[in-house]
Amino acid sequence: ILRRFPLEAGVNPQFVEIDERAQNLLLDEVVEAIADGQGQSSFDGIAEHFTGPDLQKFLHAILNLDHHFDSHPDADGIWKALDLPAGYDDASLAQECFLPGDFQHIEELKALLMTKDENSNDFKAGLRLQAIPGPELTTADLPTLESVFLNKTGKAPGSAKIGSFPTKATRAELPGMAQVEALMLRVEAGRQSRLSLNVARRSLALYDFAAEFLGTYRARKQARGFLDFNDLIMRTRHLLSDERVATWVLFRLDGGIDHILVDEAQDTSPAQWDVIRLLAQEFTSGEGARAD
């Protein structure tokens, strides 16, 4: 269809369809250009959060969801969407969760826990607390503190283990137990803010990188007259949906299509189904309707 109506579809008449291998080579080229060029900050930002082993899979996911990146919310917009105050950061979170002297109370708790039986939950908790280096508590310590101080399951997951950790006997031995329990409650209260801040940062990094990546990818495709598979589908759908030219295109196609073969891979592709629907309408309506 695009070969027959390139001007109506807004594509280069000499466009080149690129296969998956050629596309992957282009993706590598684009990422390298971003990492070494003006978009380096966006690359560094996503690299800080991306932990998957398959970069190509990640890039293809962005391409498949490119319409979600048409608008680029700023940091304030993302923070607001996650119920975080503008400018909320690690310092804000630390101020909510920690008080001077908290690390000393953790050190005292840790020392006591490490004296318990090696098979006890108290001792195992002490081992986890060894991951906190000091000399003060920071937001980087919150996941460790949450793993020790908060319930993972039960009626109230994420709630502080007040009255249940450490064991009753150990609690009686710890002079600063009241201060530890106060810290437990602050860790509980700060958990949602920590998670939201993490999502906000990852979202901002993703939007920044996607904008740079998609812009560079599209520019390089256009300069070389390339169309990838998604381009073929989206351009065809737009062509058949454009009221200015769709009737003319379908009229010219009438008689040239006897059947539509649907591959099972299209079951999960709404855009491809749109193309099929638009083509099928010509079989069943208007002057082009088929008796059979």
Where are these regions (language model features)?
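Conserved helicase NTPase motor core
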Residues: 1, 15-26, 182-292
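A structural signal for alpha-helix termini and helix-coil/disorder junctions
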Residues: 4, 33-40, 65, 115, ...
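Generic N-terminal leader/targeting and pre-domain segments
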Residues: 33, 51-52, 75
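Conserved ATP-driven helicase/translocase motor core recognized via long
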Residues: 58-230
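Conserved P-loop NTPase-based nucleic-acid remodeling module centered on helicase motor cores
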Residues: 1-45, 93, 97-101, 108
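Residue-level signal for alpha-helix termini/capping positions
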Residues: 51-55, 60-63, 67, 241, ...
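Short, glycine/acidic-rich hinge or "gate" loops at secondary-structure transitions
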Residues: 39-56, 290
